[in-house]
């Protein structure tokens, strides 16, 4: 193997640049040429390929986003479009492809491997932490820290005004950001897609807190359950005198300098991706489990089910009495 390529696909996540840096530097260390594909699979189809060298990845480990840009490519579901992507790889002599992204990105890599025998290695990069085969995805820790910073600031003003605040966080159909940030932020209530909840129980908890002199109430809401305005309306219908505000954090959770954890995780995964290609392995997804970097067959990785951390959720209920 002489030349490898790398792309980032789907939603961006802090730490992607650290992974790109690791792939490029490890590849060069082992004597490989490294090509960058701009804008994910869309750029692969459109032949947007650049050379990546040591200077290309200098001064990027601390930056959020991705220097390769990213885009969603619905057209990639069509076989004739995927053929164009394969032709781009052939044109540039790319013998191995590293794909950083979520499960949709992995499925794109899976199809390239199955249809055109492309050597592919996948790295989980998504703030949602919803990839079943790995304990943590690149970007999750940074996103949680961003949410924590917001919770801390919102609590300051909520306490001053004796208010309740709903904070809506990202995660699609996964409640991991809400759960981890909610526990770390001392939220009074965490509402997740994975757990049944009751609006009456929530309102009773707020009422009890007010009676015992509590100055604020922080409710962390995962976007996959409902929107913050919808929840606010439900609460106000039952507690019309409650001073209630809501904040939708939105895409601020995707940006910012990656944390130490995300930089180290991305560096480990990026280096391992190159090593796997040099070992002639393909269709692998790199993960971290029990603090060890491991890899799984992509078919198995996509069929796994993410285990919800119910113990942590139960702990959140104990700590929020």
Swiss-Prot record:
Q: What is its EC number?
A: 2.7.1.11
Q: Name one GO biological process term.
A: canonical glycolysis
Any one annotated GO CC term: 6-phosphofructokinase complex
Q: Which PROSITE patterns match?
A: PHOSPHOFRUCTOKINASE (PS00433)
So, what pathway does this thing act in? Carbohydrate degradation; glycolysis; D-glyceraldehyde 3-phosphate and glycerone phosphate from D-glucose: step 3/4
Quick check: keyword Kinase in the entry?
yes
Q: How is its activity regulated?
A: Allosterically activated by ADP and other diphosphonucleosides, and allosterically inhibited by phosphoenolpyruvate.
Subunit comment: Homotetramer.
Q: Which family does the similarity line name?
A: Belongs to the phosphofructokinase type A (PFKA) family. ATP-dependent PFK group I subfamily. Prokaryotic clade 'B1' sub-subfamily.
Function description: Catalyzes the phosphorylation of D-fructose 6-phosphate to fructose 1,6-bisphosphate by ATP, the first committing step of glycolysis.
Q: What is this protein called?
A: ATP-dependent 6-phosphofructokinase
Q: Which organism is it from?
A: Caldanaerobacter subterraneus subsp. tengcongensis (strain DSM 15242 / JCM 11007 / NBRC 100824 / MB4)
Question: Which lineage ranks, top first, belong to the organism behind this chain?
Answer: Bacteria, Bacillati, Bacillota, Clostridia, Thermoanaerobacterales
Q: What's the encoding gene here?
A: pfkA
């Amino acid at each position: 193997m002489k030349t490898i390529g790398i792309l980032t696909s789907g939603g961006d996540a802090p730490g992607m640049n650290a992974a790109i840096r690791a792939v490029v530097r490890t590849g060069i260390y082992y004597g490989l040429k490294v090509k960058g594909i701009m804008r994910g699979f869309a750029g692969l189809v459109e032949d947007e390929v650049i050379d990546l060298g040591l200077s290309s990845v200098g001064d990027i480990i601390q930056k959020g986003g991705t220097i390769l840009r990213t885009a969603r490519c619905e057209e990639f579901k069509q076989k004739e479009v995927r053929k164009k992507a394969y032709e781009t790889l052939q044109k540039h002599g790319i013998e191995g492809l590293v794909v950083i992204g979520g499960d949709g990105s992995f499925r794109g890599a899976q199809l390239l491997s199955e249809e055109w025998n492309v050597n592919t290695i996948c790295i989980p990069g998504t703030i949602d932490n919803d990839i079943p085969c790995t304990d943590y995805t690149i970007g999750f820790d940074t996103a949680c820290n961003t949410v924590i910073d917001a919770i801390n600031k919102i609590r300051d003003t909520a306490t001053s005004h004796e208010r309740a605040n709903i904070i809506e966080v990202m995660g699609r159909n996964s409640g991991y950001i809400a759960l981890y940030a909610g526990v770390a932020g001392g939220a009074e209530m965490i509402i997740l897609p994975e757990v049944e909840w009751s609006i009456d129980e929530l309102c009773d908890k707020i009422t009890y807190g007010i009676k015992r002199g509590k100055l604020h109430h922080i409710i962390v809401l995962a976007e996959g359950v409902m929107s913050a305005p919808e929840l606010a309306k439900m609460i106000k219908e039952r507690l019309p005198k409650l001073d209630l505000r809501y904040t939708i954090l939105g895409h601020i959770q995707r940006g910012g300098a990656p944390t130490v954890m995300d930089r180290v995780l991305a560096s480990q995964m990026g280096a391992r991706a190159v090593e796997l290609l040099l070992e002639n392995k393909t269709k692998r997804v790199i993960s971290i489990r029990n603090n060890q970097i491991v890899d799984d067959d992509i078919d198995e990785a996509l069929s796994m089910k993410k285990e919800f951390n119910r113990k942590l959720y139960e702990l959140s209920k104990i700590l929020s009495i």
